[in-house]
């Protein structure tokens, strides 16, 4: 059986990457994007008191909460104890992979080249985060690397925008991680949560329109 968060990712396709200067801003940002329809949220360990944020969000209806920038086994264990349903990292750590496997949660390490992608998959990655995908070449890069690796689920991150979110999915990504283009830390710090909700709705509506086109509506 696949991890719960992977099923949710296949359904929802969007992950809000929450970075903020303090826990209150992170909580507000997570709730704001969820109100706009983006209901998978990654609380990065760069957020002060990130574990507190995860713990406060873990039981909110319809929200799937996970940890980002998970660099060590200790961070992985702490995130899992706080209720994280997935672990995402910019790199591959076999210790973090082992913690995810032991808990049965989604593990999504970062990779850039085909060699790194295959190493991540061999270590137990359910999904591989292609990062930073904007520098690598965007959707065109995804199409190229999926030719030899069509069976490895990929998450685009680092350089994703409203304009390229659908092209990334059309190129074969199972999902897209959205950082500043959605949950801008400056907006969160300023308390402009209505703008974050508006951005989330725009991303969701962009996907809905693409789905209708694909269905021939």
Describe each model-derived feature in a short phrase.
Residues 37, 61, 83, 91, ...:
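Conserved functional loop/turn residues at catalytic and ligand-binding sites
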Residues 39-43, 80-82, 102-103, 113-142, ...:
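Glycine/Thr-rich beta-alpha phosphate-binding loop at enzyme active sites
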């Amino acid at each position: 059986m696949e991890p719960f968060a992977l099923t949710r990712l296949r359904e929802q396709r969007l992950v809000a990457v929450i970075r903020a200067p303090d826990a209150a801003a992170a909580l507000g940002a997570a709730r704001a994007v969820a109100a706009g329809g983006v209901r998978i949220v990654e609380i990065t360990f760069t957020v002060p008191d990130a574990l507190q944020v995860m713990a406060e969000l873990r039981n909110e209806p319809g929200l799937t909460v996970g940890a980002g920038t998970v660099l060590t086994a200790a961070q992985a264990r702490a995130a899992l104890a706080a209720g994280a349903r997935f672990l995402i990292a910019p790199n591959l750590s076999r210790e973090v992979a082992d913690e995810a496997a032991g808990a049965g949660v989604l593990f999504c390490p970062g990779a850039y080249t085909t060699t790194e992608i295959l190493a991540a998959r061999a270590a137990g990655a359910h999904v591989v985060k292609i990062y930073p995908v904007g520098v690598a070449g965007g959707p065109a890069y995804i199409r190229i690397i999926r030719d030899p690796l069509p069976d490895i689920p990929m998450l685009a991150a680092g350089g994703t925008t409203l304009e390229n979110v659908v092209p990334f999915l059309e190129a074969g990504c199972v999902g897209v991680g959205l950082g500043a283009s959605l949950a801008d830390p400056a907006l969160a710090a300023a308390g402009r949560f209505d703008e974050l909700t508006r951005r989330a709705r725009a991303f969701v509506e962009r996907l809905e329109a693409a789905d209708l086109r694909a269905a021939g509506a």
